Amino acid sequence: MIRAIVTDIEGTTSDIRFVHNVLFPYARERLAAFVTARQYAEPVKSILDNLRNEIARPDASTAELIETLFTFMDEDRKSTALKALQGIIWHDGYVNGDFTGHLYPDVLPALEKWKAQGIDLYVYSSGSVAAQKLLFGYSDEGDITHLFSGYFDTHIGAKRETQSYRNIASYIGVAPSQILFLSDVYQELDAAEEAGLRTLQLIRGEGDGASRHHQVHQFDDINPEQILS
């Protein structure tokens, strides 16, 4: 039986256009001024130091780091430092009511149902844990963070690496075969399956012909009790 469900965010619980058309531009417009103003204050100072280590340039100036961050955004680089800074900037946007975290309408009822069935729910996204909590804490449906038992980001490992899913299974103390991973990206599902997890691919638009994973269009198409472990 399935004892835990780990879900992706972009394209799975939330429209990817919310991230790319709302969140990313919001952070991009404010990034340079934000970093310049807070470069000597924590946690930004430590994040910038981590970025210097990430790019192997310990003497990089703040201006050079800002340029690097813009390059990372252009490349959609899954940089832990970039994600951390974006999360801090987004916090202000959520708190100020500039936007709310998008949820597909089928998501909340399914999460509540699975939680009531005794299934532990987790989030795994390339966005920082802080950013994940903001999206679900200030969602279209209000604060739903109480539904989740934990959150994972790139600190646990990259989403297309098999070891990341082994790490998650070990961390939550559930056998991989009793964990269901939900994502719209088949390469992530491949990695999870190789680690022994059960997988389902969310198809919110056109089908993915390159994928060999079972596909569903929305959360209410998913019945964890029918998934054999």
Swiss-Prot record:
Pfam families: Hydrolase
GO biological process entries: L-methionine salvage from methylthioadenosine
Cofactor note: Binds 1 Mg(2+) ion per subunit.
Gene3D superfamilies: 1.10.720.60, HAD superfamily/HAD-like
Cofactor(s) the record lists: Mg(2+)
Subunit details: Monomer.
Function: Bifunctional enzyme that catalyzes the enolization of 2,3-diketo-5-methylthiopentyl-1-phosphate (DK-MTP-1-P) into the intermediate 2-hydroxy-3-keto-5-methylthiopentenyl-1-phosphate (HK-MTPenyl-1-P), which is then dephosphorylated to form the acireductone 1,2-dihydroxy-3-keto-5-methylthiopentene (DHK-MTPene).
Similarity comment: Belongs to the HAD-like hydrolase superfamily. MasA/MtnC family.
Name by which UniProt lists this protein: Enolase-phosphatase E1
Gene transcribed to yield this protein: mtnC
